């Protein structure tokens, strides 16, 4: 199932560099400077939470602490500008991935009912020159269909694609 989705995603849109735009880099720099309120050159957990909100990310205290721990090389409990840029690049990449998966879902959902049905997969596979049996298509749907309604909704699709792409849940 995942090979069909990856093929569709690649056909629809050429691969693009996931670097940050100049505007995004500037926004990150401004956010860092704005929220480094004491001018120390680092951002602590409280400052990071405010910065993340300003950039459009709502996060729990636990998520903020984990973000700091993931990039805090010296164990100071705060992050410097380079660590902040690295962390924000990853967060923005996650958001881009969700947008790409949403587009892929919409392409595969041929009847535009908000769910991917076995018929959608069969027609898409045929358009791509793939030949799957009904049993193979049913197995693909069952792999992702958590609510067991016989179709794959957006949440199920996202979960399955993330599991496929990242080897986890």
UniProtKB/Swiss-Prot annotation:
GO biological process, one term: abscisic acid-activated signaling pathway involved in stomatal movement
One CC-aspect GO term: cytosol
Keyword Ribosomal protein assigned: no
Induction: By wounding and infection by the bacterial pathogens X.campestris and P.syringae.
Residues annotated to bind Ca(2+) 4: 145, 147, 149, 151, 156
Gene3D superfamilies in UniProt: EF-hand
EF-hand domain span: 23-58, 59-94, 96-131, 132-167
Alphabetized SUPFAM superfamilies for the sequence: EF-hand
Residues holding Ca(2+) 1: 36, 38, 40, 42, 47
Pfam families for the chain: EF-hand_7
Residue sites binding Ca(2+) 3 per the record: 109, 111, 113, 115, 120
A molecular function (GO) term: calcium ion binding
Keyword Repeat: yes
Subunit note: Interacts with TON1A and TON1B. Interacts with SAC3A and SAC3B. Interacts with UCH1 and UCH2.
Family matches, as PANTHER family: EF-HAND SUPERFAMILY PROTEIN (PTHR23048:SF59), MYOSIN LIGHT CHAIN 1, 3 (PTHR23048)
Chain's role: Potential calcium sensor.
Entry protein name: Probable calcium-binding protein CML20
Organism: Arabidopsis thaliana
Gene, per the UniProt record: CML20
């Amino acid at each position: 199932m995942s090979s069909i989705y990856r093929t569709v995603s690649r056909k629809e849109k050429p691969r693009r560099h996931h670097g940050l735009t100049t505007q995004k880099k500037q926004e990150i720099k401004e956010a860092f400077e704005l929220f480094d309120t004491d001018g120390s050159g680092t951002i602590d957990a409280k400052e990071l939470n405010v910065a993340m909100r300003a950039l459009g990310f709502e996060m729990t205290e636990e998520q903020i602490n984990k973000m700091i721990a993931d990039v805090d090389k010296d164990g100071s409990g705060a992050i410097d500008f380079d660590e902040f840029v690295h962390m924000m690049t990853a967060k923005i990449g996650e958001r881009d991935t969700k947008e790409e998966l949403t587009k892929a879902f919409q392409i595969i959902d041929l009847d535009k009912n908000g769910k991917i049905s076995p018929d959608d997969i069969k027609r898409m596979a045929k358009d791509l020159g793939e030949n799957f049996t009904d049993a193979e298509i049913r197995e693909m749907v069952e792999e992702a269909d958590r609510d067991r309604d016989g179709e794959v909704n957006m949440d199920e699709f996202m979960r399955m694609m993330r599991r496929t792409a990242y080897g986890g849940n």
